[in-house]
Amino acid sequence: MSLLEITDAEFEQETQGQTKPVLVYFWASWCGPCRLMAPAIQAIAKDYGDKLKVLKLEVDPNPAAVAQCKVEGVPALRLFKNNELVMTHEGAIAKPKLLELLKEELDFI
């Protein structure tokens, strides 16, 4: 499964009631570190898309999801599992370190 870009209107539907864990990548077009992280997020979506739903949400036009997830800076990640927020991370992170973080919550990584 590829990376799916969502908006505030789709946030609840795409993150809640899912059969697999959901990773939400919060980003901004003006954010340099976000651009650096984008390939890692895309690779994770490609490599684990059958077991992990990966969503991309631009922060500026989507303030409701940003507030709901208490995102204070970008890039930011939120991992939902069984409708619960189980992992948060703010700031740029390299793919190996991101996989390490995800591995703590996901047994298939």
Swiss-Prot record:
Database matches in SUPFAM superfamilies: Thioredoxin-like (SSF52833)
GO CC list: cytoplasm; cytosol
Molecular function via GO: protein-disulfide reductase activity
Any Pfam family the entry gives: Thioredoxin
Residues annotated as domain Thioredoxin: 2-107
Alphabetized PROSITE patterns for the sequence: THIOREDOXIN_1 (PS00194), THIOREDOXIN_2 (PS51352)
Biological process annotations from GO: cell redox homeostasis
Disulfide bonds: 31-34
Coiled coil: none
Keywords: Disulfide bond, Electron transport, Redox-active center, Transport
UniProt xrefs under CDD domains: TRX_family (cd02947)
Sequence similarity: Belongs to the thioredoxin family.
Protein name: Thioredoxin-like protein slr1139
Taxonomic source organism: Synechocystis sp. (strain ATCC 27184 / PCC 6803 / Kazusa)
